[in-house]
Amino acid sequence: MMIFSFLVTFFILGAQVLGENMKELVGTWSSKSNTVFTGPGFYDPVSELLIEPDLPGISYSFTEDGHYEEALYRVTSNPKNHSCPTATLIYQHGTYEIKSNGSLFMTPIAVDGRQLLSDPCGVDTENDASLYSRYVQKTWFKKFQVMVDSYNGRRKLQIYQFDGSPMQPLYLAYKPPMMLPTSALNPTDSASETKSSLRKRIKRSLENQYRTNARIETSSAKYEFWWWTAIAGIGLGSAVIFLH
């Protein structure tokens, strides 16, 4: 009986920890360039258009009920010709799961992933230097940490890849997250949406999102408040000890 009670308690505590981890992830996170964000500013599913940001970077968004969105813009230099860098834009969304060991597993909706590869000096660039295609790639991260950056006071997400190497840090940009609808955007069955109905669904989703008072996280005021509160507490405690 004691063993059964222990196991029940163990699983309950484990579920609570996973729930707290999911709450920590909620929001839209962006890399230091602060130019790449998930949502309609990166991918237009109605026009099948990936929109190139001003600077390279990455962005991830997470909801508390297990949905995610990914926006990647990477530029790779060409060692043989520095004027011919290769650019890649990738959009995916789907569901994510936090495993009991703290790893993060993301499963995309296969019909919705898109990739735009731009190679201005490639072999087949006489007609078009860009290749637009479907893209699907499951992702597994070994672990992640959410913390407050000691330098700028912003919330920071540090993700570690499957081999344990850290990715570039991400910073909280929007909460609630800025995302497209979490269901399939490009269904392929007989009940496929028209562009008009898809446009209306996206518009309705974004309108509902704005009603949640999504806000951009750029101020560190609340962190400064707690910092100075802690300093004041330490000073008060020191004064009491000194007077005694």
UniProtKB/Swiss-Prot annotation:
The record's GO CC annotations read:
endoplasmic reticulum membrane
Q: Which InterPro entries match?
A: Rot1 (IPR019623)
Q: Could you tell me the keywords of this UniProt record?
A: Endoplasmic reticulum, Glycoprotein, Membrane, Signal, Transmembrane, Transmembrane helix
Instruction: Name the membrane topology term.
Output: Single-pass type I membrane protein
Q: Which domain of life is it from?
A: Eukaryota
- Entries under Pfam families matching the protein: Rot1
User: Where in the cell is the protein located?
Assistant: Endoplasmic reticulum membrane
Which family, according to UniProt? Belongs to the ROT1 family.
The protein depicted here goes by the name: Protein ROT1
Species name: Debaryomyces hansenii (strain ATCC 36239 / CBS 767 / BCRC 21394 / JCM 1990 / NBRC 0083 / IGC 2968)
Species classification = Eukaryota, Fungi, Dikarya, Ascomycota, Saccharomycotina
